[in-house]
Amino acid sequence: MEKLRIFTWTGYVTPENITQVNKILVNKGYNYQVEVIATKAEDADQMFSVIRKKQCDITFLTLFFIKMHGEQISKLLQPININSPRLTNYKNLDPKLTHIAMGMQQDKPLYIPWGGGIYGFFINTHKVEKQDIPTSVKDLWADKWRNKFSLNQGQFWYNVGLTLQALDFHPFYLEQLALKNDRKALKELLAKQGAVLNKFKQLYNNTGGFWQSSTKFTEHLDIVSSWGPEIKVQNDKGGKWQLIDFKEGHLAWLDTINFVRDLKGEKLAAAEVVANYFINRQVQQRIVNELSMLPASIDLESRGLLDHYPNLFSADLFVPPYSQLSYSLMQQMVEQASDSH
């Protein structure tokens, strides 16, 4: 048996998934078995490096990673044949999610939508009274939450987005200016003693801690930022973490299934069978129920938060593939904030 190597995020592929999909491959006569590589996905640069070193065959890329940094990852992927007879579950995917420009190459998708979520902030309602729950992103800068909330470290653009929202800009305003190549406006916006940089430094100074691939729960944190999956685990243990529904909305992301460029022939066909399994009803319902994610499939009993907030996936709050210019400007902001931290 040959290996089909999956590169994915923590919690996305269970041992039971592997057993089931390997049974399907055997029953269909494929000479392939899947395994999940030990390296877990963390961020765009790390995923690019693992794919470039040819350490995986099927990936679970966050959509906007595909065209980040001069579209470097897109060059390592192949378009999905959405009419493949092996992708029988594709028709149940939300049509709003199947042809998003940042995942397309010459009108063909480099991705199959899988599931997503938001960069959410969750509050411990065991410790915080209902009337004290924040309502605006701006509240994160209040003294009462100093050292009591956490931020993600690797994907710092979310924190830049929050800062811009807190100053009444669009969260992707930096990218909008960069795409227009409006360097004068960018220079003014990011001036050394300017409002944006100062606000961003305050955010980094006020945080009670950073996390990388999955959020940490420590005694002093009343608010944790999270992609969602860990919240369910805590609440199943008796926790009472609740999404803070910021009036500015939530920055959203979509994770996808992708095939590396070298897959072909029987191996590519086997990869399509695997992808089709991961968009079936059972798996899609599991990511809602167990990971608190937003599913790509519409043919489900519950779509989680989408049942209550149907616009989470259609808003203009899907993180874009940042251009080299805006990305490097944000990196400089982080360096300046870290120097003062």
Q: Where are the regions a protein language model picked out?
A:
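Structural recognition of the beta-strand scaffold that forms the well-ordered cores
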Residues: 5-8, 35-37, 57-61, 113, ...
